[in-house]
């Protein structure tokens, strides 16, 4: 019994050793093969950041603002249709019949654009004009300005009792009170000067001029920039009589360009 037992033990051990070597060899072969099969997976993993970067770039490209459309000089023909709604208060040709609403006929395109922009931004406050200006594009504003600029303001009539004082202030100012002459910015005949800040005043309704000067006198401003402070600083030096005289004089002021043609004999 003891002999068989001793003889059996080496056989078992030999088989076990052989099995261990076989398993070890298999494991080594599997390890040698693993890098070859995992290489594509690594390449796939490496490709993911690039794909992620591409995906991240897509929203950025989508959210990039579109190029701003170039604004062209105003087109009076296009402006006529766009200005139709303005006619309810300002008249279809810019000559308002209600003196609380300013005449726009003959006003410069640049000035009209500037005021519409101010209404839209809220720097010049007026609930009605805010609603009118809000949907307008910059091109719309230029077209509307060009249309009204092409029209001729109808002449007004000044109060003869106020003309002398109004003319003096308009042409000479009052150096003693540090009041400059109006014509320095608005020209001697009231047609204004180039640019957006010096409007035409000829034939403007006296009631509108008076109300505007009084508002400036009382501290109302149409913006925070330096130009917007000029008229309030001047109006605060004017008396009630000064304002009435200037407003009446301006209404009766007619530039030669705005005179109606003489009747044929």
Predicted regions and their residues:
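Bacterial N-terminal signal peptides that target proteins for export
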Residues: 2-15
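N-terminal signal peptide c-region/cleavage motif recognized by signal peptidases
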Residues: 25-27
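Electrostatic cytochrome c docking/interface patches
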Residues: 36-83, 97-98, 150-176, 262-265
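The feature marks the first
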Residues: 64-122
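The canonical Cys-X-X-Cys-His
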Residues: 79, 86-93, 144, 179-189, ...
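Sequence context surrounding c-type heme c attachment/ligation sites in exported
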Residues: 80-84, 109, 173-183, 203-212, ...
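Axial heme c-ligation environment in periplasmic c-type cytochrome domains
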Residues: 97-103, 119-161, 194-200, 217-244, ...
């Amino acid at each position: 019994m003891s002999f068989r037992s001793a003889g059996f033990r080496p056989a078992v051990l030999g088989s076990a050793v052989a099995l261990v070597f076989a398993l070890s060899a298999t494991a080594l072969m599997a390890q040698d093969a693993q890098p070859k099969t995992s290489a594509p997976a690594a390449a796939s993993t490496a490709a993911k950041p690039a794909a992620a970067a591409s995906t991240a770039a897509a929203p950025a490209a989508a959210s990039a603002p579109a190029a701003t459309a170039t604004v062209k000089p105003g087109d009076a023909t296009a402006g006529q249709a766009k200005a139709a709604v303005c006619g309810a208060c300002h008249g279809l040709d810019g000559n308002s019949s209600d003196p609380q609403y300013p005449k726009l006929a003959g006003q410069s395109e640049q000035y009209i654009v500037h005021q519409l922009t101010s209404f839209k931004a809220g720097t010049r406050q007026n609930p009605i004009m805010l609603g009118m200006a809000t949907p307008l594009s910059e091109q719309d504003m230029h077209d509307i300005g060009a249309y009204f600029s092409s029209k001729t303001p109808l002449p007004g009539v000044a109060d003869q009792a106020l003309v002398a004082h109004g003319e003096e202030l308009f042409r000479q100012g009052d150096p003693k009170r540090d009041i400059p002459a109006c014509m320095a910015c608005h020209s001697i005949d009231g047609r204004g000067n180039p640019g957006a800040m010096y409007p035409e005043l000829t034939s403007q309704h006296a009631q509108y001029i008076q109300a505007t000067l009084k508002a400036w006198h009382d501290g109302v401003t149409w913006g925070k920039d330096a130009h917007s402070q000029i008229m309030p600083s001047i109006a605060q030096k004017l008396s009630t009589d000064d304002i009435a005289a200037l407003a009446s004089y301006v209404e009766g002021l007619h530039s030669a360009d705005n005179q109606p043609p003489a009747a044929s004999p």
